């Protein structure tokens, strides 16, 4: 028997010296409510109302919503992103590789080509909230690092840049659903509206810049971050703090990026496209002469859109003189002090363009000049603090009445995972680089997933203590110098070494939408899981003698020998690369025979938690205070850690039930020395969860509220309970008796609760003990009418029902190892001929 009853009593310090009787007498006592209540009082488990102040920190565990202060690293490197372009004809490519796909695989791959996201309601936030002031000590530094990260993502084709209300530009290869206008034709069109000669010749883009009808209107009805031409480094100035440098515009239609002077449409642009090499000094003079003449003529009948946008000089269009972009205004102004930004701006003659343009332009649904989520930077991971990671907060979609209920998806539980992966195979794991950014998002989702920044001047002004920005003195010269300060000057000088003339580009406002799925939305994990599981399903069918399995972006391959694994690795890598999936070969890990996956070590002996988790548990117990009420939010953290390793302990989850109860009641929990000792003893010795073996069920258990019965081979047993018990409790006791009497690892029962092996709803002592006795037991469902133990449980030993031949098949969850292929054309050769490990390790269902 797996458990000595005396041992259990001693463990819980319930042993009062009396000798325990047989299990059939003792076990029902553990279901007694009175005993459970006494034990709870002894161990101080039920006392939820405490008057002492709660403890809010245990070791590294703080409450669920408390802020651990992140550390800013001025030396952070922005990671580089490969040009990820998942092939659009991914289904055809898979079919060339493996033959016809199953319905399941096709459905999953169609979900992500392209992904769609249309929430019911979207809350738009001002641009100020684009970059979160997460590091108050390093505001400027964080601003530029975040802005550089966004720029890198845009250049890698992961973001769209909003050009006008209805158009966006991006870099990288376009998908078919993005080519909505003019399919890259060379379009030359002259619009004589209001004296604006606009000529547009543009072979590369998808949306011709002077597009028909509504687009012309949108060029007049600009919003702040307008559509801009992309010829040459001096393309139109970007959404200006204060208008734009109009003379720098090319023959292209005047689609300035920003808020423009309303009169600007009267300017006749005749500069040739070679003018991009003009020095900015000349450009500035031209800009000022133009702007002075056409300063206030907003008579053209078209309303220029100025959504409520608060940059410090953005109002300059409508009140006060109009200047060029905020950064370049410092050129002409007198230095206000030795720390004036004009010293920095005068370092360079050519600061480059105010905005950057993508290789392609597309139409998008109406997108306001707002953001829907904020971004900030953190360390890439605890082991890599040299690189940064962008955190995108789209939590608005998970909150409130309008929250989106994200789709659920199956994750294999520990037992299924062990059944699947516990074998004598050699393993390696592949690292998919930037996995989320593989999955394309439909451009129609862009208005819902907007990030960006309001530009440096506004950002600094909002965070500085200077309140003059609220006095409506927008656009005046002294207002320009309000932002000068020693701290800003020193920060910018240091950043100048890193970013050079890009400081100018990054100081402009920008609005970006996602072109690939972002990590901060609950839809993304679902889509990624669908994607990788479909790909692995295809790989498993292509190589039937191997195993491929994935969880999110973690893909593992298993094969019988190391040589076989290497040839499999080459073949699978080439296949994935042909689909456009980027692997990081330097991070491929070869595990030998024990695989590290999802926090577990899985070998032929079963599964155990990885060492770092075991270490965390030891630290947790070392720091766990006794007799002090611990905040229930901290208990959530503790239970999260202990719950992960619970299946490897003797008593399992039931041992944690007192903690679960206090969390549910939102009350503090006090660990008594006894309960802490009991738990720590449980977690000091972890036992592997073994792979279930297929077999024939020979032992059956059944119970009624008053009695129990067993059928073991041709032997029948029965017994009665001292007092009637709830039916589930009685069935659980019968299963325990069957296990301890027969030692069988396979038991037939007709009770669904016993089958589920979740013993958390039983009386606490019984739950713990039953878990201990039944650890490693597999259950087979047998209908009551066919259960051979049914008669003995009702006290009838004379009647013999024939023993069933009930086969047991271990489950692998929803992972179909043997997805039946649709009929495959005969010319497809077999991949590699090896003795198939599947025939040794797994029996096909």
UniProtKB/Swiss-Prot annotation:
Residues 349-692 are annotated as: Polymerase/reverse transcriptase domain (RT). InterPro entries: DNA/RNA_pol_sf, DNApol_viral_C, DNApol_viral_N, HBV_DPOL, Rev_trsase/Diguanyl_cyclase, RT_dom, Viral_Replic_Matur_Polypro. Activated by host HSP70 and HSP40 in vitro to be able to bind the epsilon loop of the pgRNA. Because deletion of the RNase H region renders the protein partly chaperone-independent, the chaperones may be needed indirectly to relieve occlusion of the RNA-binding site by this domain. Inhibited by several reverse-transcriptase inhibitors: Lamivudine, Adefovir and Entecavir. It comes from the Viruses. One of its GO terms (molecular function) is DNA-directed DNA polymerase activity. One of its GO terms (biological process) is symbiont-mediated suppression of host innate immune response. Residues 359-602 form the Reverse transcriptase domain. Multifunctional enzyme that converts the viral RNA genome into dsDNA in viral cytoplasmic capsids. This enzyme displays a DNA polymerase activity that can copy either DNA or RNA templates, and a ribonuclease H (RNase H) activity that cleaves the RNA strand of RNA-DNA heteroduplexes in a partially processive 3'- to 5'-endonucleasic mode. Neo-synthesized pregenomic RNA (pgRNA) are encapsidated together with the P protein, and reverse-transcribed inside the nucleocapsid. Hepadnaviral virions contain probably just one P protein molecule per particle. This is Protein P. It comes from Hepatitis B virus genotype A3 (isolate Cameroon/CMR983/1994). The lineage of its organism: Viruses, Riboviria, Pararnavirae, Artverviricota, Revtraviricetes.
């Amino acid at each position: 028997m797996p458990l000595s009853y005396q041992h259990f009593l001693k463990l819980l310090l319930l042993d009062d010296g009396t000798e325990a009787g047989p299990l059939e007498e003792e076990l029902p006592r553990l279901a007694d409510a009175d005993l459970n209540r006494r034990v709870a009082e002894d161990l101080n488990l039920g006392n939820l109302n405490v008057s002492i102040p709660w403890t809010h920190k245990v070791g590294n565990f703080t409450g669920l919503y408390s802020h651990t202060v992140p550390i800013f690293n001025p030396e952070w490197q922005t990671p580089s992103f490969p040009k990820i372009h998942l092939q659009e004809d991914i289904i055809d490519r898979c079919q060339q590789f493996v033959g016809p796909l199953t319905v399941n695989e096709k459905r999953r791959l169609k979900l992500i080509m392209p992904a769609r996201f249309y929430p019911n309601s979207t809350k738009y936030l001002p641009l100020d909230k684009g970059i979160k002031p997460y590091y108050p000590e390093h505001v400027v530094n964080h601003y530029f690092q975040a802005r550089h990260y966004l720029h890198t993502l845009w250049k890698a084709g992961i973001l769209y840049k909003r050009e006008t209300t209805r158009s966006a530009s991006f870099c990288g290869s376009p998908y078919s659903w993005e080519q909505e206008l003019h399919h890259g034709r060379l379009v030359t069109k002259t619009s004589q509206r209001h004296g604006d000669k606009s000529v547009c010749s543009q072979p590369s883009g998808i949306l011709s810049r002077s597009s028909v009808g509504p687009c012309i209107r949108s060029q007049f009805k600009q919003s702040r971050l307008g559509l801009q031409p992309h010829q040459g480094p001096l393309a139109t100035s970007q959404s200006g703090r204060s208008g734009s440098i109009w003379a720098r515009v090319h023959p292209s239609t005047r689609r300035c990026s920003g808020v423009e002077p309303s009169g600007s449409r009267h300017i006749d642009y005749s500069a040739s496209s070679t003018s991009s090499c003009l020095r900015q000094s000349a450009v500035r003079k031209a800009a000022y002469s133009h702007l002075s003449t056409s300063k206030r003529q907003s008579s053209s009948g078209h309303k220029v859109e100025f959504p409520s946008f608060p940059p410090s000089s953005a109002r300059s269009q409508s009140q006060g003189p109009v200047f060029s972009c905020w950064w370049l205004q410092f050129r002409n102004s007198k230095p206000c002090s030795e720390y004036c930004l004009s010293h920095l701006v005068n370092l360079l003659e050519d600061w480059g363009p105010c905005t950057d343009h993508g290789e392609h332009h597309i139409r998008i649904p109406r997108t306001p000049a707002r953001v829907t989520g904020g971004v900030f930077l953190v360390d890439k991971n605890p082991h890599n603090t040299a690189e940064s990671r962008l955190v995108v907060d789209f939590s608005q979609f998970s909150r409130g009445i309008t929250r989106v209920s994200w789709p659920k998806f199956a994750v294999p539980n520990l037992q299924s995972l062990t059944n699947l992966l516990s074998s004598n195979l050699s393993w390696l794991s592949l690292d998919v680089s930037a996995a989320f950014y593989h999955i394309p998002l439909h451009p129609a989702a862009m208005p819902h997933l907007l990030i960006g920044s309001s530009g440096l001047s506004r950002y600094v002004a909002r965070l500085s203590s200077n309140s003059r920005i609220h006095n409506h003195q927008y656009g005046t010269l002294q207002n320009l110098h309000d932002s000068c300060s020693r701290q800003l000057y020193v920060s910018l000088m240091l950043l100048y070494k890193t970013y050079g003339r890009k400081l100018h580009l990054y100081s402009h406002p920008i609005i970006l939408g996602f072109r690939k799925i972002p990590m901060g939305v609950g839809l993304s994990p679902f889509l990624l899981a669908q994607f990788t599981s479909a790909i692995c399903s295809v790989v498993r069918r292509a190589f039937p003698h191997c195993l491929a399995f994935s969880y999110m972006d973690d893909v593992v391959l298993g094969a019988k020998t190391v040589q076989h694994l290497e040839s499999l690795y080459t073949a699978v890598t080439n296949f994935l690369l042909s689909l456009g999936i980027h692997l990081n070969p330097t991070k491929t890990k070869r595990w030998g025979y024990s695989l590290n996956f999802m926090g577990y070590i899985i070998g032929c002996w079963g599964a155990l938690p990885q060492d770092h988790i075991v270490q965390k548990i030891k630290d947790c117990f070392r720091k766990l205070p006794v007799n002090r009420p611990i905040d229930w939010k901290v208990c959530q953290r503790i239970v999260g850690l202990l719950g992960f390793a619970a299946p490897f302990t003797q008593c399992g989850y039931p041992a944690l039930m007192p903690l679960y109860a206090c969390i549910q009641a939102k009350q503090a929990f006090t660990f008594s020395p006894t309960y802490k000792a009991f738990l720590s003893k449980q977690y000091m010795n972890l036992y592997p969860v073994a792979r279930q073996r297929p077999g024939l069920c020979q032992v059956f258990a059944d119970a009624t509220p008053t009695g129990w019965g067993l059928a073991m081979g041709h032997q029948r047993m029965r017994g009665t309970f001292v007092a009637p018990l709830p039916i589930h409790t009685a069935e659980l006791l019968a299963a325990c008796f069957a296990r301890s009497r027969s030692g069988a690892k396979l038991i037939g029962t007709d009770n669904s609760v016993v089958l589920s092996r979740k013993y958390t709803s039983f009386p606490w002592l019984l739950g713990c003990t039953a878990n201990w006795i039944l650890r490693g037991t597999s259950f087979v469902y047998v209908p009551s009418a066919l259960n051979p133990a049914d008669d003995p449980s009702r006290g009838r030993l004379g009647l013999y029902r024939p023993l069933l031949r009930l086969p047991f098949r271990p489950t692998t969850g929803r992972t179909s190892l043997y997805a039946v292929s649709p009929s495959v054309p005969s010319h497809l050769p077999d991949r590699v001929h090896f003795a198939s490990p599947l025939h040794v390790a797994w029996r096909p269902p």
